[in-house]
Amino acid sequence: MDPNTVSSFQDILMRMSKMQLGSSSEDLNGVITLFESLKLYRDSLGEAVVRMGDLHSLQNRNGKWREQLGQKFEEIRWLIEEVRHRLKITENSFEQITFMQALQLLFEVEQEIRTFSFQLI
């Protein structure tokens, strides 16, 4: 797992939490919750790749695993659209930087999850 991605997640979540506390920002609960969920999922997928000796149990759960994977890709697409939308409507430079970094992170994580999933299939 890339330590830069982990610190990027933590940094962006911290920034979004600060933005949420700001009087001018809209409610970011859904975005923050999905970001946290995505981080946990990415981390667990990475751990599964590291423990590839556990393939038998993974194959037993394969149907459910594929369904979860599809759901995560839908969540990533929703997050990308939501972050793009917020980037377009915000005029605050701190928020713009945060959303641009969040967008970049989402693209990186989407690629990482694709790579992990191909290794597990």
UniProtKB/Swiss-Prot annotation:
Keyword Transport attributed: yes
Superkingdom classification of source: Viruses
Mutagenesis / variant outcome for changing L34Q: In strain: A/Fort Monmouth/1/1947-MA
GO terms (BP aspect): exit of virus from host cell nucleus through nuclear pore
Entries under SUPFAM superfamilies matching the protein: Nonstructural protein ns2, Nep, M1-binding domain
Classification via InterPro entries: Flu_NS2
Protein purpose: Mediates the nuclear export of encapsidated genomic RNAs (ribonucleoproteins, RNPs). Acts as an adapter between viral RNPs complexes and the nuclear export machinery of the cell. Possesses no intrinsic RNA-binding activity, but includes a C-terminal M1-binding domain. This domain is believed to allow recognition of RNPs bound to the protein M1.
Name of this protein: Nuclear export protein
Protein source organism: Influenza A virus (strain A/Fort Monmouth/1/1947 H1N1)
Gene that encodes the chain: NS
